[in-house]
Amino acid sequence: QIQGIQAPHFRAISSIAFHHLLDETKVNGRVVRSVVDREYGRIDWNDPEINQDPDFLQKFVRQLGKQIHQAALAEGEQTNTKLRTFINNIVEGFATSPEGIDQLRKRSVMVQAAILSVEVPHDVAEAVRGAYRDICRENEDDMTPVAVRSSAAGEDSRKKAFAGLQDTYLNM
């Protein structure tokens, strides 16, 4: 133990929680596409300032998630589909058509914004909050910074411990 450096504390939230999010929440695909098309088209993706800002895409996607959520509330639930179905359609569309990097990025933005636009089911939110409370209690600190990451199959096993296939968010 190095003074001032905390040993890592790990908490796993089961992938079942993510599947619950995908299967129990719904999005309005038309609203997602409309908002993403409009806002994505306003960005000059070749602008050096945008390409040099490591936080731009994350902030952009979060903003889109909020806009989609508000627009979907105003629209109602008449044409909502399961989040999983929407994502599968977006991914399948990419897999079956030749697209460049810009279209791939746009599809990625669409999927991320759709996920961020839905309300997290209560049991999933409670599992995350409970894991965080446990870490804070162990550290005797009510605001412990944490890294949040998703792991793909095969990551972090005894034979293969690596990060990088999925996203990691530090100091959450």
Please state what every model-predicted region is:
Residues 1-172:
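N-terminal beta-alpha lobe that positions the nucleotide/phosphoryl donor
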